[in-house]
């Protein structure tokens, strides 16, 4: 059986965007690996500067007219960029610029390019770690060894695979074949075997189950639009629910204690962080201490304190203003999905909303390509329907 590799056709007006995006993806994936020790300090800022300059040049060359929506979007993006950049959130600052500059490019095309880049980087990094070119750190917990596979934390590689899984599901939709599902299960299982990352593996399996249900029109997918309407508010519901749990958490309440234990102490750590650092309108730099290694394989010193909830991390690091805009924009994006009857995108974004309650990696573009949907749906050219997948080709 021959393997077909389809390379999306890139227009002249898109070339600078994809050059910039490729540089960004490669750099910020490498930033998560032991390869990063060979790069100069603050290399991420230099990369961000180059990417932004390329994107600005592409805007000047390719965009003839800026409509009112694009102008409002630009103002909001500049505000969010300033907030994130000032708190040293280089990857997030870059993400905001890419979301805006990718507004007129097919999300399907971006998704396919992302898959190719990510697969290439995963192969390069994993093989490099096995060949001894970079370190393959191993954690031993109980009777199980967890390999980092060249990354600086065991969860990073599986998180990239999870993103690939969601992108494949969205690209294929009803055309997703059983051989595709089996290949994705094998790929996820491969990285689960070496890293024991249950979260990414479990969510990948869940997303594939949803894809199968959607493919064969089981349960409510054809008629129950009320469920889809509820999904529109996924980000508001998930953020409010988990924040409420953190604020009211008490070990004296048995069900809360059991839930906290099940979630790996996330409620307790989140509450402690809120009490320790508080919240502000514009955010601030916070030196949380996690389990990840530095570029030389050393663990951070100090007591462990990490906030895995994306919503609370955004609230504390980037501030109330950023979080309000973030949730409002995402809710409007979900509403547009509902209006366009793009139910697959609506469901996948809802799954990501749930995932964000317990995993902050979803904030970053190299782990979550679906942020591009914001620009395409809200700021893209009016002639692009962005409804069902076939309308985007």
What feature does the model see in each segment?
Residues 32, 276-279, 360:
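A structural signal for alpha-helix termini and helix-coil/disorder junctions
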Residues 2-29, 44-63, 68-254, 299-385:
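Hydrophobic transmembrane helix bundles of membrane-integrated enzymes that assemble
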Residues 41, 45-48, 240-272, 287-293:
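Flexible juxtamembrane loops connecting transmembrane helices in multi-pass membrane enzymes
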Residues 35-40:
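Membrane-interface helix-loop junction between the first two transmembrane segments
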Residues 259-318:
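Long extracytoplasmic/lumenal interhelical loops at the membrane interface
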């Amino acid at each position: 059986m021959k393997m077909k590799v389809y390379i999306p056709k890139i227009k002249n007006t898109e070339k600078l965007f994809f050059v910039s995006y490729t540089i960004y993806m490669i750099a910020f994936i490498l930033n998560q690996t032991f390869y990063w020790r060979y790069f100069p300090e603050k290399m991420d800022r230099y990369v961000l500067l180059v990417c932004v300059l390329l994107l600005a040049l592409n805007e000047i060359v390719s965009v003839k007219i800026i409509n009112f929506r694009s102008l409002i979007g630009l103002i909001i993006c500049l505000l969010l960029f300033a907030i994130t950049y000032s708190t040293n959130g280089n990857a997030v600052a870059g993400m905001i610029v890419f979301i805006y500059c990718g507004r007129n490019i097919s999300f399907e095309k971006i998704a396919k390019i992302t898959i190719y880049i990510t697969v290439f980087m995963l192969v390069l990094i994993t093989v490099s770690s096995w060949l001894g070119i970079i370190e393959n750190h191993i954690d031993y917990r109980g009777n199980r060894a967890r390999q980092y596979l060249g990354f600086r934390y065991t969860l990073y590689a599986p998180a990239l695979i999870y993103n690939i899984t969601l992108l494949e599901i969205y690209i294929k939709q009803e055309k997703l074949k059983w051989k595709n599902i089996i290949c994705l299960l094998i790929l996820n299982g491969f990285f689960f075997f070496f890293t024991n990352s249950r979260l990414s593996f479990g969510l990948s399996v869940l997303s594939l189950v949803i894809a199968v249900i959607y493919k064969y029109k089981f349960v409510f997918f054809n008629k129950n639009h009320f469920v889809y309407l509820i999904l529109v508010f996924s980000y508001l519901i998930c953020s409010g629910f988990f924040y409420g749990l953190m604020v009211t958490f008490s070990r004296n309440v048995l069900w809360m204690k059991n839930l906290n234990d099940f979630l790996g102490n996330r409620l307790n750590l989140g509450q402690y962080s809120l009490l320790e650092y508080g919240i502000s309108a514009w955010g601030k730099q916070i030196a949380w201490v996690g389990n990840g290694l530095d570029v030389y394989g050393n663990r951070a010193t100090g007591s462990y304190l990490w906030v895995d909830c994306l919503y609370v991390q955004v609230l504390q690091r980037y501030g109330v203003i950023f979080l309000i805009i973030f949730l409002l924009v995402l809710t409007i994006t979900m509403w547009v999905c509902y209006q366009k009857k793009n139910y697959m995108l609506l469901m996948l974004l809802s799954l990501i909303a749930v995932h964000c309650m317990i995993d902050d990696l979803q904030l970053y573009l190299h782990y979550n390509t679906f942020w591009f949907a914001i620009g395409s749906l809200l700021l893209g050219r009016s002639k692009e329907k962005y409804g069902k997948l076939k309308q985007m080709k």
